[in-house]
Amino acid sequence: MKKIFLDLDGTLAKFNVRNALQRFETEKGFFAKLGAYKGIEKINEMAKNGNVYIISASPNEQADSDKMKWIEKYLNNVPIENRLICRCGDNKAEFLKTKGIKIDKNCYLLDDYTKNLVEWEEVGGVGIKRITKVADNSRKLWKGLEVKNLGNLAIVVA
């Protein structure tokens, strides 16, 4: 069965790193207040079959809590055990290994950060670059799959 792993900030949630770096350190509830990109309801619908996971990097416990609130608001069909938070800078594939999840060719990661996608593919998964107006400028370095509209994700992983 295919498993779909989704990054949060900049991929599903409207997060502009250039405008947010100082705010999330001081503004309580910052991550919980982020808006969602168009098409989030299709992702929530996909999650009903239990094979959708959230894997988000977080700087601290307050942000962990905020992100869980965001997930509950927009992606309440994602099973609680599939809502995973690692630390900023962690290799997401390595983190999942510590949770007993092995990445293989049936594991897809949708992320806006090319480094995460490269690390994912190095262990046998399939990376999908999320294209947004604020996606990192390493897009030109990414040669794999891309998704601009969240509603098209189901087509890409079919």
Protein language model regions, located:
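Conserved Lys-Pro-Asp/Glu-containing loop-to-beta segment of HAD-superfamily phosphomonoesterases
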Residues: 3, 85-115, 120
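Short hydrophobic segments within beta-strands
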Residues: 7, 55-57, 110
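Acidic, Mg2+-coordinating phosphoryl-transfer loop and its flanking beta/alpha structural elements
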Residues: 104-146
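A short, structured active-site edge motif that brings together acidic residues
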Residues: 55-60, 68, 74-94
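Asp-based phosphoryl-transfer active-site loop
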Residues: 2-16, 120
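Short, acidic loop-to-helix structural element flanking the phosphoryl-transfer center
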Residues: 22-54, 61-65
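Short amphipathic alpha-helix with an adjacent loop that forms part of the alpha/beta core around
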Residues: 94-102, 140-158
